[in-house]
Amino acid sequence: MAAILLDVDGVLHVSGEPIPGAVEAVARLRVEGHRLRFVTNNSTRSRAALVEELRGMGHELEDADLQTTPIAAAEQLGGRRVYALVMAAIVPDLTGIELVGDSADAVLVGGCDETVEPNQVFSYMNLARAFSEIQAGADLFALHRNPWWQTARGPMLDGGAFVAALEYATGVEATVIGKPSAASFAAALAALDAEPELTWMVTDDLEQDVRGAQLFGMKTLLLRTGKFRPDALERSSTVPDAVLSSIAQVPDWINRTL
């Protein structure tokens, strides 16, 4: 049986609206004995809230089945003084991190949501403070570096754009905690006790997830849902193992490869 990493936003749902056939496909993969791990770069809601949302759609999973960037950040930055540009909802998941307004030894940048909160989190003054902290020697960390994500209203600017701005202004490269970092993929495979060459990454994100998974030695399935753009695929040097219409086709595809 295969080990499968499932992206969430754009694969299972878009803005909370389930992708047709997603619940049935995931359930079938479980019944057929495949090992599944949900891996998301969503950094605007707690893991508990994200799990509850998926359960509400009909998915069966435990909290530990969902790998999130705030939980990973807490493990990586625990005990450090951190100036964090993040949504308030994820603060409970940053257990062990000392959140400070100045004299930080690390700056952490999260993602955006569809509310007005990013207007405050990523204000000029907050970005300027992050710039100053990095200039003073703080390390720069990003929960992810996605420049945008797909919503029901269309593409929306994401936190990766602000990460790039801070990198440009400071000359400091961010350490990425979520996908496509090697650490993120390594943690996911360790949870499944899986080898990269026997693992599939299922996603709608060509440049972050597909490219990153391939560099880590995994096989990849790109779905034509969520943020998928045909023109981006045509222009890209990244070639997934297969392009499927949606997650509904994944069980049949995986089974044919075994």
Predicted region positions:
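Asp-based, Mg2+/Mn2+-dependent phosphohydrolase catalytic module
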Residues: 2-8, 13-23, 27-34, 43-67, ...
